Amino acid sequence: MNAKVFNPSIITKEQIAGLHFPSQEVLVLPNEIKQRRKNAQEGLLLGNRYKAKVRIVFEDTETLKQVEATIWGLTDLHVILKKGTTIPMHRIYTIDICP
């Protein structure tokens, strides 16, 4: 599935806690996975320094979703948003800096 072809549902970060995530990786190509990690790290730096928000497109068990939030932390497996809300890294299609 190419996330850029579909229109994701826009949600708030508070809604993420009630979502369920499958264990399958959404990206296929190794370079896409590497770029996602790089974008997450850039988002973390901008979030910590300037409180800049990113647009994250991800997929839970139901549909493609989009949230705009500040990245507060990263682990190998998760992107951490404000108030400890997490999104599994393997379910994220794109992370872009908000204009």
Label each residue range with its predicted role.
Residues 1-63, 95-99:
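Short glycine-rich, low-complexity segments
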Residues 49-50, 63-76:
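Short, compositionally biased strand/turn segments
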Residues 60-67, 85-88:
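Short coil-to-beta-strand transition motifs
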Residues 72, 76-99:
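Short, Lys/Arg-rich amphipathic alpha-helical interaction segments
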